[in-house]
Curated annotation (Swiss-Prot):
Gene Ontology MF term list: RNA binding; zinc ion binding
Protein name: Putative pentatricopeptide repeat-containing protein At2g01510
PPR repeat spans: 47-77, 78-108, 109-143, 146-180, 183-213, 214-248, 249-283, 284-314, 315-349, 350-384, 385-415, 416-450, 451-485, 486-516, 517-551, 552-587, 588-618
Organism classification: Eukaryota, Viridiplantae, Streptophyta, Embryophyta, Tracheophyta
Pfam families per record: DYW_deaminase (PF14432), E_motif (PF20431), PPR (PF01535), PPR_2 (PF13041)
The species this protein was found in: Arabidopsis thaliana
Keywords of this entry: Repeat
Superkingdom, taxonomy of origin: Eukaryota
Region described as Type E motif: spans on this chain: 623-699
Amino acid sequence: MKLYCNSNEVRSRTLATLRQLRQPSPATFLDTRRVDARIIKTGFDTDTCRSNFIVEDLLRRGQVSAARKVYDEMPHKNTVSTNTMISGHVKTGDVSSARDLFDAMPDRTVVTWTILMGWYARNSHFDEAFKLFRQMCRSSSCTLPDHVTFTTLLPGCNDAVPQNAVGQVHAFAVKLGFDTNPFLTVSNVLLKSYCEVRRLDLACVLFEEIPEKDSVTFNTLITGYEKDGLYTESIHLFLKMRQSGHQPSDFTFSGVLKAVVGLHDFALGQQLHALSVTTGFSRDASVGNQILDFYSKHDRVLETRMLFDEMPELDFVSYNVVISSYSQADQYEASLHFFREMQCMGFDRRNFPFATMLSIAANLSSLQMGRQLHCQALLATADSILHVGNSLVDMYAKCEMFEEAELIFKSLPQRTTVSWTALISGYVQKGLHGAGLKLFTKMRGSNLRADQSTFATVLKASASFASLLLGKQLHAFIIRSGNLENVFSGSGLVDMYAKCGSIKDAVQVFEEMPDRNAVSWNALISAHADNGDGEAAIGAFAKMIESGLQPDSVSILGVLTACSHCGFVEQGTEYFQAMSPIYGITPKKKHYACMLDLLGRNGRFAEAEKLMDEMPFEPDEIMWSSVLNACRIHKNQSLAERAAEKLFSMEKLRDAAAYVSMSNIYAAAGEWEKVRDVKKAMRERGIKKVPAYSWVEVNHKIHVFSSNDQTHPNGDEIVRKINELTAEIEREGYKPDTSSVVQDVDEQMKIESLKYHSERLAVAFALISTPEGCPIVVMKNLRACRDCHAAIKLISKIVKREITVRDTSRFHHFSEGVCSCGDYW
């Protein structure tokens, strides 16, 4: 097939390669004479060809203006002249000048079209690139694309390219015969383009039609499967590639290792690691980094560090992975160490893991660290990179600097779904759930589609209100948006229903999920754990392993939480001790905190202290608070005072819970002077007790109550109901437990104050506002007191209703005078 209509153009292009003879040397004039002789012999215009050489030489030296001056002054130009000048402008990014020359050309060659088309494609101006391709194919000059045109136009494709555009190019390639074996590169770029525009179905058809495939063909589809989440298919194709005799490359290992990470298949990943070692690819920087990332994503911090230390060549990716690995393990000091080391290595600052480090600052609520990182990002101009801007939004929001967060959010060059989710998440994480849901409504108005992370965040906000109606509305919206089959959205729904007290709905959503991964199982395990069903949580964990999935750190945390809530000390200890040797998971701070809670609740303080001494890090606020709470339950005043001393010495301690717990311990012992000392210390540090609130949803409206609240429109009816219930439960044997009252007042005043705690007001209001037999769900922002717990147990028996109270510790399902927690919380 004839691809060039102007044979002189081919000859002219051939002569242009003679510029290689004109390297600066003492023989320059001799070389020039030889070129001129060749030009005269072939019948070309000597002046034009010599000028073309000069233009190209000037462009090669970066002197674009001088080259353009020579070009403009040429009396006779040919297509080589203009193509050379267009190429020069394109290489310097001056596409406007290049386009002017292109539009003014009376005759264009395939080279002309390809040069300009390539610039548009490389710079993501796909509409213009494909428009030029169509114009070229329809032009009257008989200029048809060659294989270089196809391999220039297609490689830059991404999901912004219309799917039909790739199909049209494919059809033209077939028409011109470029789908045959001599042009395998064209078939390979077409295959990659179909993968990039998410048409795996067409990619698979093309793959099967390619008569003789090479390693690039296999690598392209392996990567395409992995990017689309079809991890099993990616692994199967890799095995097929090996069986067909094609040798894997560094790209092969990178793609298939990513697929293994997606499958959470640790054993298979280890096999691939071994194969990369035997084939020698493990020493390749890109493969080594992917192996490093594989171990990091499986929470194997020790293995990640060992491989990092053994790598022959470290680049910025290696440092990014090891910093992220320590961050995921909550070992922030180690992350900071490697970040400082990375700064001394001479890497381009734009490649620094600012997003990861900002996430650490957000998790630590360290505004100072966050601002330092912000300054570094500005110096590196990395704040213009969208994901760093999103991380800045997240950091400022989680440090409760919402004005700064919104300012950065508004200044982002492009507000994506991730940007909106970062801001929404910041509000939700700080307990401003209403503000988060309002932002979600605004996001919907901006015509952006919510993704799995967005839904997980708004479902969390919905769960915080315990509003089953709101949760079901979000469930319906997820169905309409086509995200129900997404495992992360499904997992978020499981979590939401569980936190709204509807474990039955949570289990149903889980069972209806078409695909389940570790996140789905973790949601179910946590749902059972939070609702006090330890046996079901442990059963779900066992089924997860039976399904072939490898448990991760979150899975173990869910089981430990279940054991803690149910008092399964021996089982909890077994799971904790099995983490490293059996499951290959390094315990994080949360796992240690859960074990301390389990041991402390059971009064096993010697074991708890031994565990704290053996931890690889210092006990933090959560751990000492857990010990203090256990001491309050078991009246261990000496250890309580030690725990309180540790807590009160923490500069960052802003939570009043530790002070309140210590006050309760002293009040129960009748040491009122020490109660006053604790309250004085609170005032001096400017720490205020968080007021107790409870809320209940009745008739699609949330009603909020505080202790001794007299502001509700139905206040008189509520008080009458409480007095009526108090009289009835007293006949059932109820005796007020005044040990939780920290005011030094007479006994009768203590009893009266207990009657009007926020959770009892909410229960009383629900009883007078809902039909008989209707279940009641009450939420509380603090831990339920022991007296209210005892009272609501008896109330559930008297009124013959299921009453659910969710506090900060767990769910309490009251029915027939019994609580699901077994009085253990």
